[in-house]
Amino acid sequence: MDVGMMMIFASYGWDDCPDGQVWEEEIKLARIAADSGFNCLWSAEHHFNDYSFVPDNINLMTYLSAICPDIDVGTAAVILPWHDPLRVAENAAVLDLLSKGRLRFGMGRGLARREFDAFRISMDETRGRFDEAAPMIIEALKTGFMEGDGPFYKQPRIEIRPRPQHSFEGRIYAVASSEDSVDSAAKLGAHHVMFADRPWEMRAPVIEHGRELHRKYH
């Protein structure tokens, strides 16, 4: 069994709790999880809200990989529509280099309108941006090169430096709850990430459908 800890960085319901204290407490929990033999530390990406405020989970995991050297670190997830795919690939490559191959790279497309509005990105573009950026990033992490010629990202072929040092086989994840996202994750060959926000009796058929699609595509 693989056991991880999801880091949210939330202060919702904590009256007058400083943001710095929230972060200090989460880092303490991360250390406890690492020392207790957990397999992976995971972090969401959210912005501007008490519900969760960790705007750069790759940056966070680079720090945690240094202070917790015996546990994997994962992103659940980097919200691709909010980022340039080239920068995501570069930053992930740096984290994986410094952590000696301990990154589990997870991607998502986001869902909070408040966040999309702040980044001046239409929610109508989330599926297109994700489906375009995700394979570009995966290809860059696997081969060291990125290029793209889609409607959102015109990227001339360029080499990623530092070059990826470790195989990302089996270390790519995608958050998927909707039917479209489950299909997208399967096409990418990514591990399927699903949050426990409803009874597992409702989730189990979706998970099994994702497995069937993965077998179909691969």
Where are these regions (language model features)?
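N-terminal beta1-alpha1-beta2 module of alpha/beta enzyme domains
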Residues: 1-73, 170
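Hydrophobic faces of well-ordered beta-strands that scaffold small-molecule active sites
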Residues: 3-7, 41-43, 73-76, 103-107, ...
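Active-site beta-loop-alpha junctions enriched in small/polar residues
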Residues: 8-10, 46, 78-80, 108-110, ...
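Flexible loop/turn segments at secondary-structure boundaries
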Residues: 12-13, 50, 82-83, 181-182, ...
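Alpha-helix N-cap and loop-to-helix initiation/capping positions
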Residues: 17-25, 52-56, 83, 87, ...
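Aromatic/hydrophobic pocket-lining residues that form π-stacking "cages" and hydrophobic walls in ligand
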Residues: 26-29, 61-64, 88, 92, ...
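Active-site-adjacent beta->alpha loops and helix N-cap segments on the catalytic face
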Residues: 53-59, 199-212
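Internal, glycine-rich beta/alpha segment that forms the wall or movable "lid"
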Residues: 84-190, 204-208, 217
